[in-house]
Protein backbone atom coordinates (compact mmCIF):
# COMPACT_ATOMS: atom_id res chain seq x y z
CA UNK A 1 0.00 0.00 0.00
CA UNK A 2 1.48 3.36 -1.03
CA UNK A 3 1.31 6.41 1.18
CA UNK A 4 1.17 9.81 -0.48
CA UNK A 5 3.43 12.62 0.71
CA UNK A 6 0.48 14.83 1.78
CA UNK A 7 -0.80 11.95 3.93
CA UNK A 8 2.55 11.78 5.70
CA UNK A 9 3.10 15.53 5.94
CA UNK A 10 -0.34 16.48 7.25
CA UNK A 11 0.08 14.86 10.69
CA UNK A 12 3.51 16.42 11.09
CA UNK A 13 2.11 19.82 10.15
CA UNK A 14 -0.37 19.38 13.01
CA UNK A 15 2.50 18.36 15.29
CA UNK A 16 4.49 21.49 14.47
CA UNK A 17 1.37 23.58 15.09
CA UNK A 18 0.99 21.98 18.54
CA UNK A 19 4.66 22.57 19.33
CA UNK A 20 4.22 26.26 18.48
CA UNK A 21 1.18 26.37 20.80
CA UNK A 22 3.20 24.74 23.58
CA UNK A 23 6.13 27.13 23.22
CA UNK A 24 3.74 30.10 23.12
CA UNK A 25 2.05 28.83 26.30
CA UNK A 26 5.42 28.42 28.04
CA UNK A 27 6.46 31.92 26.94
CA UNK A 28 3.23 33.42 28.24
CA UNK A 29 3.45 31.53 31.54
CA UNK A 30 7.07 32.62 32.02
CA UNK A 31 6.23 36.27 31.39
CA UNK A 32 3.24 36.16 33.75
CA UNK A 33 5.30 34.57 36.52
CA UNK A 34 8.19 37.01 36.13
CA UNK A 35 6.17 40.18 35.52
CA UNK A 36 2.58 39.53 36.69
CA UNK A 37 1.57 43.18 36.80
CA UNK A 38 2.43 43.66 33.14
CA UNK A 39 1.32 40.37 31.58
CA UNK A 40 -1.39 38.81 33.74
CA UNK A 41 -4.22 40.97 32.38
CA UNK A 42 -5.55 41.87 35.82
CA UNK A 43 -8.84 40.72 37.32
CA UNK A 44 -10.55 40.94 33.91
CA UNK A 45 -8.47 37.99 32.72
CA UNK A 46 -10.65 34.82 32.76
CA UNK A 47 -7.51 32.80 33.54
CA UNK A 48 -6.64 34.90 36.60
CA UNK A 49 -7.41 32.03 38.98
CA UNK A 50 -5.13 29.71 37.00
CA UNK A 51 -2.36 32.31 36.98
CA UNK A 52 -2.63 32.64 40.74
CA UNK A 53 -2.37 28.87 41.16
CA UNK A 54 0.83 28.71 39.12
CA UNK A 55 2.24 31.76 40.92
CA UNK A 56 1.94 29.94 44.26
CA UNK A 57 4.27 27.26 42.91
CA UNK A 58 6.46 29.31 40.58
CA UNK A 59 9.66 27.30 41.08
CA UNK A 60 7.94 23.97 40.40
CA UNK A 61 6.21 25.47 37.38
CA UNK A 62 9.52 26.62 35.89
CA UNK A 63 11.12 23.21 36.55
CA UNK A 64 8.31 21.66 34.52
CA UNK A 65 7.57 24.07 31.67
CA UNK A 66 11.08 25.11 30.61
CA UNK A 67 12.40 21.55 30.20
CA UNK A 68 9.02 20.71 28.65
CA UNK A 69 9.49 23.28 25.90
CA UNK A 70 13.04 22.05 25.34
CA UNK A 71 11.82 18.45 25.14
CA UNK A 72 9.20 19.18 22.49
CA UNK A 73 11.57 21.32 20.45
CA UNK A 74 14.43 18.81 20.54
CA UNK A 75 12.17 15.82 19.91
CA UNK A 76 10.69 17.47 16.83
CA UNK A 77 14.21 17.98 15.46
CA UNK A 78 15.25 14.44 16.37
CA UNK A 79 12.41 12.91 14.36
CA UNK A 80 13.54 14.70 11.18
CA UNK A 81 15.11 11.99 9.00
CA UNK A 82 17.33 14.45 7.12
CA UNK A 83 18.77 15.73 10.42
CA UNK A 84 19.56 12.21 11.64
CA UNK A 85 21.22 11.25 8.36
CA UNK A 86 23.41 14.37 8.19
CA UNK A 87 24.21 14.74 11.89
CA UNK A 88 24.07 11.27 13.41
CA UNK A 89 26.63 12.01 16.13
CA UNK A 90 24.78 15.17 17.19
CA UNK A 91 21.50 13.24 17.04
CA UNK A 92 22.86 10.75 19.57
CA UNK A 93 24.10 13.43 21.96
CA UNK A 94 20.85 15.37 21.73
CA UNK A 95 19.05 12.10 22.41
CA UNK A 96 20.85 11.82 25.76
CA UNK A 97 19.86 15.38 26.62
CA UNK A 98 16.31 14.59 25.53
CA UNK A 99 16.05 11.61 27.88
CA UNK A 100 17.36 13.61 30.86
CA UNK A 101 15.01 16.49 30.04
CA UNK A 102 12.10 14.07 29.69
CA UNK A 103 12.81 12.54 33.09
CA UNK A 104 12.68 16.01 34.66
CA UNK A 105 9.42 16.78 32.85
CA UNK A 106 7.76 13.51 33.83
CA UNK A 107 8.89 13.61 37.46
CA UNK A 108 7.86 17.24 37.92
CA UNK A 109 4.49 16.43 36.32
CA UNK A 110 3.90 13.78 38.98
CA UNK A 111 4.70 16.28 41.73
CA UNK A 112 2.48 18.94 40.16
CA UNK A 113 -0.39 16.45 39.94
CA UNK A 114 -0.72 16.57 43.72
CA UNK A 115 0.72 19.97 44.69
CA UNK A 116 -1.04 22.06 42.02
CA UNK A 117 -4.45 20.46 41.82
CA UNK A 118 -6.68 22.90 39.92
CA UNK A 119 -9.20 20.44 38.47
CA UNK A 120 -9.66 18.19 41.49
CA UNK A 121 -9.30 14.40 41.50
CA UNK A 122 -10.23 14.21 37.82
CA UNK A 123 -7.21 16.28 36.80
CA UNK A 124 -4.94 14.45 39.25
CA UNK A 125 -5.98 11.09 37.79
CA UNK A 126 -5.31 12.24 34.22
CA UNK A 127 -1.96 13.92 34.85
CA UNK A 128 -0.70 11.14 37.12
CA UNK A 129 -1.62 8.40 34.66
CA UNK A 130 -0.09 10.09 31.65
CA UNK A 131 3.02 11.22 33.54
CA UNK A 132 3.63 7.56 34.41
CA UNK A 133 2.90 6.50 30.81
CA UNK A 134 5.30 9.18 29.56
CA UNK A 135 8.10 8.00 31.84
CA UNK A 136 7.53 4.35 30.91
CA UNK A 137 7.65 5.18 27.18
CA UNK A 138 10.78 7.29 27.64
CA UNK A 139 12.63 4.65 29.66
CA UNK A 140 11.66 1.87 27.25
CA UNK A 141 12.84 4.00 24.32
CA UNK A 142 16.19 4.50 26.05
CA UNK A 143 16.58 0.79 26.83
CA UNK A 144 15.78 -0.19 23.24
CA UNK A 145 18.37 2.16 21.76
CA UNK A 146 20.96 0.82 24.20
CA UNK A 147 20.23 -2.61 22.71
CA UNK A 148 20.59 -1.18 19.17
CA UNK A 149 16.90 -1.85 18.46
CA UNK A 150 16.34 1.37 16.54
CA UNK A 151 12.83 0.66 15.26
CA UNK A 152 11.51 -0.18 18.72
CA UNK A 153 13.32 2.85 20.15
CA UNK A 154 11.63 5.14 17.63
CA UNK A 155 8.25 3.54 18.31
CA UNK A 156 8.43 4.26 22.04
CA UNK A 157 9.85 7.74 21.57
CA UNK A 158 6.89 8.60 19.34
CA UNK A 159 4.59 7.45 22.13
CA UNK A 160 6.41 9.58 24.70
CA UNK A 161 6.28 12.50 22.27
CA UNK A 162 2.54 11.99 21.84
CA UNK A 163 2.01 12.27 25.58
CA UNK A 164 4.17 15.39 25.70
CA UNK A 165 2.09 17.03 22.98
CA UNK A 166 -1.02 16.41 25.08
CA UNK A 167 -0.26 19.51 27.14
CA UNK A 168 -0.37 21.63 23.98
CA UNK A 169 -3.63 20.01 22.91
CA UNK A 170 -5.29 20.95 26.19
CA UNK A 171 -4.72 24.66 25.49
CA UNK A 172 -7.37 25.12 22.77
CA UNK A 173 -9.70 22.84 24.73
CA UNK A 174 -9.30 25.01 27.83
CA UNK A 175 -9.79 28.07 25.62
CA UNK A 176 -13.14 26.72 24.41
CA UNK A 177 -14.28 26.08 27.97
CA UNK A 178 -13.32 29.64 28.92
CA UNK A 179 -15.20 30.97 25.88
CA UNK A 180 -18.45 29.26 26.84
CA UNK A 181 -18.00 29.99 30.57
CA UNK A 182 -20.49 27.36 31.67
CA UNK A 183 -17.99 25.49 33.82
CA UNK A 184 -15.38 26.66 36.30
CA UNK A 185 -11.68 25.71 35.87
CA UNK A 186 -12.12 23.26 38.74
CA UNK A 187 -14.86 21.52 36.76
CA UNK A 188 -13.34 21.49 33.26
CA UNK A 189 -9.58 21.27 33.82
CA UNK A 190 -9.62 17.52 34.36
CA UNK A 191 -11.83 16.98 31.31
CA UNK A 192 -9.45 19.05 29.19
CA UNK A 193 -6.45 16.99 30.26
CA UNK A 194 -8.18 13.68 29.57
CA UNK A 195 -9.20 14.86 26.09
CA UNK A 196 -5.81 16.38 25.27
CA UNK A 197 -3.61 13.52 26.43
CA UNK A 198 -5.82 10.77 25.02
CA UNK A 199 -6.01 12.47 21.61
CA UNK A 200 -2.29 12.99 21.12
CA UNK A 201 -1.22 9.67 22.64
CA UNK A 202 -3.58 7.80 20.31
CA UNK A 203 -2.47 9.95 17.37
CA UNK A 204 1.17 9.28 18.23
CA UNK A 205 0.64 5.54 17.93
CA UNK A 206 -1.13 6.08 14.59
CA UNK A 207 1.70 8.28 13.33
CA UNK A 208 4.18 5.58 14.25
CA UNK A 209 2.34 3.06 12.10
CA UNK A 210 2.03 5.60 9.27
CA UNK A 211 5.75 6.30 9.47
CA UNK A 212 6.61 2.61 9.23
CA UNK A 213 4.27 2.18 6.24
CA UNK A 214 5.86 5.17 4.52
CA UNK A 215 9.37 3.86 5.19
CA UNK A 216 8.55 0.39 3.86
CA UNK A 217 6.99 1.86 0.71
CA UNK A 218 10.07 4.03 0.17
CA UNK A 219 12.35 0.99 0.38
CA UNK A 220 10.20 -0.95 -2.07
CA UNK A 221 10.28 1.85 -4.60
CA UNK A 222 14.08 2.03 -4.57
Where are these regions (language model features)?
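Alpha-helical membrane insertion/targeting regions
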Residues: 1-222
Amino acid sequence: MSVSKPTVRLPWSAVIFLVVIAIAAVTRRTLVLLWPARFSGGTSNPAAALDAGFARHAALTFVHILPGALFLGLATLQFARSFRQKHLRLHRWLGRILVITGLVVGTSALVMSFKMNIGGPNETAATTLFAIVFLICLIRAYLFIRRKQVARHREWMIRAYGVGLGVATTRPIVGMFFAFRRLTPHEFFGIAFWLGFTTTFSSGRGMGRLRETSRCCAHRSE
